[in-house]
């Protein structure tokens, strides 16, 4: 690889990753709302059209019926959850890299970067699961016509009152199935594209803003190419009525495949891919900007 990195600071990764997560949510939440509504819409009755025919139809109907606020519905949950989640995510990646280095100047291979990314996926599941559970419930309730929860805190409170801590953490296993391999792909792809973009004799840290944006966007696409099938299972499982899937995601899979085919595992694909590039481009740019600021302001942190 072209760059000889500075000693890795997991703490700086933690702080810069939190800022990157905020950037991701602001850019990507509208299409995340569309994705969840497409993934959780019920099968259409014979002879009747589906509630949403696709990504743009869902976007248009949501905007028309609920305004711009409808597209940002449930955003408080990911802002509250995503900021620490991405902080922990980038911390886990930094720690994973540091654990594999014998010396600060060691340059990691791509399989080692993938392994470091997988560690970050394990770290983030504890934060990601309740945030995703609340977000999905808030996103689908408007399209169902039922208003059970008035907001993020109300949803968390009612889930805890009805089902305890297990109700808030419903979907932990399938979230792990999604995030561990997807996070490995995410960070490995970002480092790979950055190295491709780095001219001979230059350092990766000197990449221009457009190249950082493209590298982050491509990393987001590769991440979601791995994550979409378990994400569909997660969305269905987390928004299902209590007791509908007693055996977890396996019951969701048994219902989806016979009824809707293998393609049902890629519901919301267009919305995910349209969102993946700009949202993750913003995330990595935010991370890099914050990291440069921290390196300047606190070089010894």
Curated annotation (Swiss-Prot):
Modified residues (N6-succinyllysine): 170
Keywords: Acetylation, Lipid transport, Membrane, Mitochondrion, Mitochondrion inner membrane, Repeat, Transmembrane, Transmembrane helix, Transport
Residues with the N6-acetyllysine modification: 148, 157, 170
Membrane protein topology class: Multi-pass membrane protein
Any one GO molecular function term: O-acyl-L-carnitine transmembrane transporter activity
Solcar repeats: 8-99, 108-196, 207-293
One GO BP annotation of this record: carnitine transmembrane transport
InterPro entries: Mitochondrial_Carrier, Mitochondrial_sb/sol_carrier, Mt_carrier_dom_sf
Superkingdom field: Eukaryota
Transmembrane segments: 13-31, 74-93, 113-131, 171-190, 212-230, 268-287
PROSITE patterns: SOLCAR
UniProt topological domain (Cytoplasmic) ranges: 2-12, 94-112, 191-211, 288-301
Compartments in which it is found: Mitochondrion inner membrane
Location of N-acetylalanine modifications: 2
Reaction(s) catalysed by this chain's protein: O-acetyl-(R)-carnitine(in) + (R)-carnitine(out) = O-acetyl-(R)-carnitine(out) + (R)-carnitine(in); an O-acyl-(R)-carnitine(in) + (R)-carnitine(out) = an O-acyl-(R)-carnitine(out) + (R)-carnitine(in); O-propanoyl-(R)-carnitine(in) + (R)-carnitine(out) = O-propanoyl-(R)-carnitine(out) + (R)-carnitine(in); O-hexadecanoyl-(R)-carnitine(in) + (R)-carnitine(out) = O-hexadecanoyl-(R)-carnitine(out) + (R)-carnitine(in)
Keyword Transmembrane helix: yes
Keyword flag Disulfide bond: no
One term under GO cellular component: mitochondrial inner membrane
Membrane-side (Mitochondrial matrix) residue stretches: 32-73, 132-170, 231-267
Task of the protein: Mediates the electroneutral exchange of acylcarnitines (O-acyl-(R)-carnitine or L-acylcarnitine) of different acyl chain lengths (ranging from O-acetyl-(R)-carnitine to long-chain O-acyl-(R)-carnitines) with free carnitine ((R)-carnitine or L-carnitine) across the mitochondrial inner membrane, via a ping-pong mechanism. Key player in the mitochondrial oxidation pathway, it translocates the fatty acids in the form of acylcarnitines into the mitochondrial matrix, where the carnitine palmitoyltransferase 2 (CPT-2) activates them to undergo fatty acid beta-oxidation.
Family listed: Belongs to the mitochondrial carrier (TC 2.A.29) family.
Protein name as annotated: Mitochondrial carnitine/acylcarnitine carrier protein
